[in-house]
């Protein structure tokens, strides 16, 4: 019995032309015959040469290769809810931090100014070449052939990511010049389609009186692609020379009555601003932003997409252009178009534009008022799959990238480093946007279906083992920010219970509400029944529900993305940050009911200092509640003392990490001195003593002094200090009486 030889199976669409293959194979019959190996190799080489000659003769009829992607080598398996093509993503990491707020120890998610931005191609919709006479309509993508080579856009999502690819970028009018951009990350949409000689399947954007005429530009024979296989560029004009196009000329094209020229001008601006930062200022000075905003009202989808992409790149990391876009009513026009259009490519550019705009303080109020309803109703709620059963909202198909951009727009970024406080405090910042601003938080919490949709999406991804989905990260950062000061800003059952408990203590106390008993109540050192949970939480009720806590802990146990881990820990940190009943209730849910301490303790082993800081601060908040001391002692003490023993203090977060660790150890050792004694090594004590003397880390120094003072006050632990050669006088010199009195009174 003869077996058929093994061959490589590729997709059918790759072989619509029988010669379109990377390997020319002999026929099955020849493979089965007794020909020698040498002869078969010779036949294969001849067939390959013949195929290449055949392809070269056809190069004038195909505008690009069958692998229609502007970028190569990118993959992240991001395929949830995808359409006919695949989407590939990779990411660049941005750091995180905190800023002190006088009462709470919570966080708001922030990103530094060096934000990750992305670039993707729209080759699927813009790279088809329609031969003369093939159809008489102008579809979305049939007007412009030249611009198929130079369309790129970028956004500034505040994401952690791990760079996996490089941008191979050919300069305009040059051949395949490659540049590695390590600080960038890119996601591309690969159509996987070859050029097909047929009419476009998408609905036409406008009627054309005659078929477009495609002629090669005189001086446009060089490759203009970004890491794309070389193909000839063509435009629908007799005289346009792509290599001679300049920013002033492109801005003039924007005012042309010909829609093809409008699109060419906008795409050239988009492409040039992607490559050259100085082009943004030039377009601004020439009044191009006003013209691009006007083009968002064009009836032609090609022009709409080109204008949105150009604005997206123009405002990227340019505050001047962002403010000018707002001044020209660009936000309202973008939101209006997003509300009207069903074109996924236009939606991607518009949501990317709104994301870029959302990083500027001056625009946040207008974005909250105008953009939030459209982003929620047209993108986030439909894509998440959440439904309350009473809504008549349309369930349109939403592209995953549009959802990613929309959640990124709601996600906050901060320009200043946040600080964790020594006493229970939340972090805030002077630079905020949508979900981080006070008014923005309240508006988003009150928006019907928004929190429900974000939570539903995260829970669905956790259930499907897609914990590293990049939109999960965005959703978690929004939920993290919405949990900030939740107990103070949102009426909860904990607040009512606390009010009842305060009244009960006041009635029993003869010394009034400012007695020691009242202070004891405020510090949660008393037993009080926790409120019953809602069976079906809605809106802000989700933020402190046990189902949400369970979801966060599951993510912390399964996700490998540092930004997601930090957001989960930050949300829990905010919930445990107050000095009221909510902190006690949330801490009990996390540590006792959901048994989440092992997941939190693992965060302290992370190589990312932002993750370690969030985990250490969360444990510090939880350690204030004596009910948790026993369970925390066995599960947390080893990891926390390891931080004090081995942490080098060479990161920007070291002071926050060490101060949180000192307070956690201080709280736990008070109830379990014998357990603490097992983990107090000489190296740990030496580090604590060095911290006391440190002038570079005042917060950590004060926390270390308090820890030493409490150790000396404990009969079980005083001997440990004496063994290291310390006495009362030396300890007094290290601690400093004034600072000790001040900090002790704060506790």
Swiss-Prot record:
Region Disordered, annotated ranges: 48-68
Effect of residue 118 to A: Reduces the interaction with YWHAG
Location, primary (coarse class): nucleus
SUPFAM superfamilies membership: ARM repeat
Post-translational modification: Phosphorylated by AKT2; required for interaction with YWHAG and subsequent localization away from desmosomes to the cytoplasm. Phosphorylation of Ser-118 by AKT2 promotes PKP1-driven cap-dependent mRNA translation and decreases intercellular adhesion, phosphorylation is promoted by insulin. Phosphorylation by RIPK4 at the N-terminus is required for its role in differentiation of keratinocytes and DSG1 localization at cell junctions.
Region (Required for WNT-mediated nuclear localization): 160-269
Protein's UniProt keywords contain Phosphoprotein: yes
Annotated InterPro entries: ARM-like, ARM-type_fold, Armadillo, Plakophilin/d_Catenin
Example of a GO MF term: lamin binding
Result of altering residue 171 to A: No effect on interaction with YWHAG
Region (Required for binding to single stranded DNA): 1-234
GO cellular-component term (any): plasma membrane
Effect on the protein upon substituting residue 155 to A: Abolishes interaction with YWHAG
Family affiliation: Belongs to the beta-catenin family.
PANTHER family membership: PLAKOPHILIN-1, PLAKOPHILLIN-RELATED
Main function: A component of desmosome cell-cell junctions which are required for positive regulation of cellular adhesion. Plays a role in desmosome protein expression regulation and localization to the desmosomal plaque, thereby maintaining cell sheet integrity and anchorage of desmosomes to intermediate filaments. Required for localization of DSG3 and YAP1 to the cell membrane in keratinocytes in response to mechanical strain, via the formation of an interaction complex composed of DSG3, YAP1, PKP1 and YWHAG.
Disease: Ectodermal dysplasia-skin fragility syndrome: A form of ectodermal dysplasia, a heterogeneous group of disorders due to abnormal development of two or more ectodermal structures. Characterized by features of both cutaneous fragility and congenital ectodermal dysplasia affecting skin, hair and nails. There is no evidence of significant abnormalities in other epithelia or tissues. Desmosomes in the skin are small and poorly formed with widening of keratinocyte intercellular spaces and perturbed desmosome/keratin intermediate filament interactions.
Assembly behavior: Part of a complex that contains DSG3, PKP1, YAP1 and YWHAG; the complex is required for localization of DSG3 and YAP1 to the cell membrane in keratinocytes. Interacts with DSP. Interacts (via N-terminus) with KRT5/CK5, KRT8/CK8 (via rod domain), KRT15/CK15 and KRT18/CK18 (via rod domain) as part of intermediate filaments. Interacts with VIM (via rod domain). Interacts with DSP. Interacts with DES. Interacts with FXR1; the interaction may facilitate the binding of PKP1 to PKP2, PKP3 and DSP mRNA.
Protein name, entry field: Plakophilin-1
Lineage of the organism: Eukaryota, Metazoa, Chordata, Craniata, Vertebrata
Gene from which the chain derives: PKP1
